[in-house]
């Protein structure tokens, strides 16, 4: 059997951006060779197949990630600043970080996706989301980032699939070791990531997106800082989203970037009344909402898009207005997982007030002294 013709056909499909036909042709060959000769396709064909699969995987991840919302209002100034940041990366061919800061439900993720959806022509995108539960697992965000980087490495023929897997296996099985081992691996990992980012960004500019970076473990921040310290003359955009709180080691990292003029910062503010009203009206369609109801919803939501969306759903279902819906409560519970039981109870009570509640009243509701409430707050 001459595999050359199959290889040429697969190459043609690859060049014409038809991944489905590449995969179909590959498996036809696999089945034929296995049935007739009991062998597998040659290494060149296998590598081409893995390249196409890696690109397809990467494209599907990005498409899923960048799904646009149908309800997007305001943030014109923030969007312009984000677009200016990405333009700067392309024009100067220099790495730079951007920090998008805001409270729960303020729209950090929505704004980021809205802008990145218009940048895919110029940038490749790799992302990771950080979780509080994984802060004790060393370098977990880098596992996610390397998963995406691996697809690009294979797609661009920088390394073969087997070579990439061998390198990954040399880092992550050892993460449960002693602190000294972790420190050594952090240094090695930073050098490896630096090399990979340089090679990938030579092909096309790159975005490294880290969501909820306030949950990044200290070792992951150390790797990120080492990479940014040594990355020069490559178009790599480091975009990080963060809650209002910041662990000290992450704060120190941002301060050092600021001193080197390598960090842009955008803090998202709640929507104003006019924009909030337009947002609600867009989500509820032709449903009539009185000025009084709009004012009440705005007072409780404080212009936070996530809350506005929940209250719009209530209106559409014709339900009685409830400031603390089950979805809002679940989101707050996940985002504020570090709260004690008393702090959670205080949040529940505060959510029921449309205006500030007195400390004395809260103390009475909680069955605590005024001093204890002040300490909790």
Regions inferred by a protein language model and the residue ranges of each:
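Canonical tetratricopeptide repeat
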Residues: 6, 40-41
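Conserved small-residue packing positions in alpha-helical repeats and bundles
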Residues: 10-12, 50
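Amphipathic alpha-helical segments of tetratricopeptide repeats
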Residues: 30-31
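Short coil/turn linkers that connect adjacent helices within long alpha-helical scaffolds
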Residues: 35-39
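Key residue(s) within conserved catalytic/signature motifs
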Residues: 3-7, 16-19, 23-27, 57-377
């Amino acid at each position: 059997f001459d595999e050359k013709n199959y290889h040429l056909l697969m190459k043609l499909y690859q060049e014409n951006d038809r991944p489905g036909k590449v995969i179909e042709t590959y498996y036809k060959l696999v089945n034929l060779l296995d049935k007739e000769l009991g062998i597998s396709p040659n290494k060149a064909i296998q590598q081409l197949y893995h390249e196409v699969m890696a690109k397809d995987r990467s494209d599907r991840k990005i498409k899923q990630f960048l799904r646009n919302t149908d309800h997007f209002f305001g943030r014109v100034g923030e969007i312009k600043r984000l677009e200016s940041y990405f333009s700067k990366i392309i024009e100067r061919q220099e790495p730079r970080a951007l920090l998008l800061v805001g409270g729960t439900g303020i729209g950090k993720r929505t704004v980021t996706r809205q802008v990145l959806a218009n940048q895919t022509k110029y940038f490749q995108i790799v992302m990771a989301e950080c979780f509080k539960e994984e802060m004790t697992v060393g370098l977990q965000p880098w596992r996610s980032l390397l998963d995406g980087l691996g697809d690009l490495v294979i797609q661009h023929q920088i390394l073969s699939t087997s070579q990439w897997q061998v390198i990954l296996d040399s880092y992550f099985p050892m993460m449960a070791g002693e602190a000294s081992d972790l420190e050594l691996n952090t240094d090695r990992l930073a050098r490896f990531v630096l090399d990979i980012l340089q090679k990938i960004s030579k092909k096309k500019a790159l975005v490294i997106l880290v969501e909820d970076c306030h949950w990044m473990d200290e070792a992951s921040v150390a790797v990120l800082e080492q990479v940014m310290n040594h990355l020069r003359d490559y178009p790599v955009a480091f975009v990080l989203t963060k809650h209002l709180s910041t662990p000290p080691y992450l704060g120190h990292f941002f301060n050092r970037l600021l001193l080197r003029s390598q960090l842009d910062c955008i803090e998202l503010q709640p929507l104003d009344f006019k924009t909030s009203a337009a947002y609600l009206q867009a989500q509820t369609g032709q449903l009539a909402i009185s000025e009084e109801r709009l004012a009440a919803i705005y007072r409780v939501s404080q212009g936070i898009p996530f809350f506005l969306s929940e209250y719009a759903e209530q209106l559409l279902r014709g339900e009685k207005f409830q400031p603390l819906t089950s979805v809002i409560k679940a989101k707050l519970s996940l985002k504020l997982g570090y709260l004690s039981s008393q702090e959670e109870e205080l949040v529940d009570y505060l959510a029921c007030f449309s205006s500030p509640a007195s400390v004395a009243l809260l103390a009475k509701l909680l069955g605590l002294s005024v001093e204890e409430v002040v300490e909790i707050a």
